[in-house]
């Protein structure tokens, strides 16, 4: 018996704003929206079921120990789209026969796209 990844959860200052960004990034759709909590659900019910956003009083102050990795058929076009949604490009890295771009979401959470 093993576990499976059910949700990815973000602590954030503004759940509504951050969930709008990640909804545009992933295509996940809002199913619960409150001032202090937003839940997005996967439209196709495969993989991670949803992304949760919980309001916390303090902003992010240090590098995350965990991050989300995204894949795209055309990473460069997707990076430009994500920047248009409010993401920030931080770094480009190569290793182990692959490459990826490190980015920040609107609240400073790290994620990568390759």
Range-by-range predicted roles:
Residues 1-19, 66:
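N-terminal beta-strand motif that seeds the catalytic metal site of vicinal oxygen chelate
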Residues 2-10, 31-33, 38-42, 46-54, ...:
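Vicinal oxygen chelate
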Residues 61-82:
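Mid-chain, well-packed structural core segment of small domains
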Residues 14-15, 74, 100:
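Residue-level preference for nonpolar/small residues embedded in alpha-helices
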Residues 55-60:
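Short, flexible, solvent-exposed loop/turn segments with mixed acidic/basic and small polar residues
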């Amino acid at each position: 018996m093993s576990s499976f990844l059910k949700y990815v959860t973000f602590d954030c200052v503004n759940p509504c704003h951050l969930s709008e960004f990640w909804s545009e990034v992933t295509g996940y759709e809002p199913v619960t929206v409150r001032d202090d909590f937003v839940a997005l659900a996967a439209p196709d019910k495969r993989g991670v079921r949803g992304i949760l956003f919980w309001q916390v009083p303090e902003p992010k102050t240090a590098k995350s120990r965990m991050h989300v990795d995204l894949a795209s058929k055309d990473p460069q076009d997707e990076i430009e789209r994500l920047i248009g949604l409010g993401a920030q490009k931080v770094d480009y890295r190569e290793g182990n026969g692959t490459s990826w771009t490190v980015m920040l979401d609107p609240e400073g959470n790290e994620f990568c796209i390759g």
